[in-house]
A protein has these predicted regions:
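Terminal and domain-boundary accessory regions
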Residues: 1-168
Length: 168
């Protein structure tokens, strides 16, 4: 792909849980290269839940692979009591960048969660959406079936999986 200023936004828990459920693991270094080369993602934001001491190794791995880590804000009382739930943070960040970052071209979203449907539809209508990359076909929200393959892809498709899978 020619040089663009697309930006990727990854729902880290959705990516991890849905590839793991399918029996494979994403190599984050390969994945970051794939996003840059295939979709022109100059920046890639990796959203996770609250910061946890036990996940320091993961955080280093994500950053070393070239992702920008974004954590969910929680009050001290809520930490450890619920899932990451980064959906609202991702939507807010994407829409803020679409409005405020005049250099950003299009959005790449990595998630199969239907909570993003209205935003994806809106961004497609406004010609600001590149691709939804769902971790796997089987756990992707049925809402996305209305979009053509131009806008929706699956990371567990044979060719893509081969490019980004962690060698076992």
């Amino acid at each position: 792909m020619k040089e663009t200023n697309n930006q990727a936004f990854i729902d880290g828990q959705n990516l991890y849980m849905n590839t793991r459920a399918s029996g494979w693991t994403v190599d984050l270094v390969k994945f970051r290269i794939y996003l840059r080369e295939k979709y022109g993602a100059q920046k890639a934001y990796y959203f996770l839940g609250a910061v946890s001491e036990e996940n320091q190794g993961l955080y280093e791995l994500v950053q070393t692979a070239g992702f920008i880590l974004v954590f969910r804000e929680h009050s001290r009382a809520m930490i450890g009591k619920k899932k990451g739930n980064v959906d609202t943070d991702i939507v807010f960040t994407i829409m803020s960048k679409v409005i405020d970052d005049k250099d950003m071209k299009d959005v790449i979203l990595v998630s199969g969660d239907g909570d993003y449907f209205k935003m994806v539809k809106y961004l497609i209508e406004k010609k600001r959406f590149c691709k939804l990359l769902a971790p796997n076909r089987h756990s992707t929200s049925s809402l996305y079936r209305v979009f053509t393959p131009r806008y929706v892809g699956f990371l567990n498709d044979k060719d893509t999986k081969k490019k980004i899978s962690l060698a076992v």
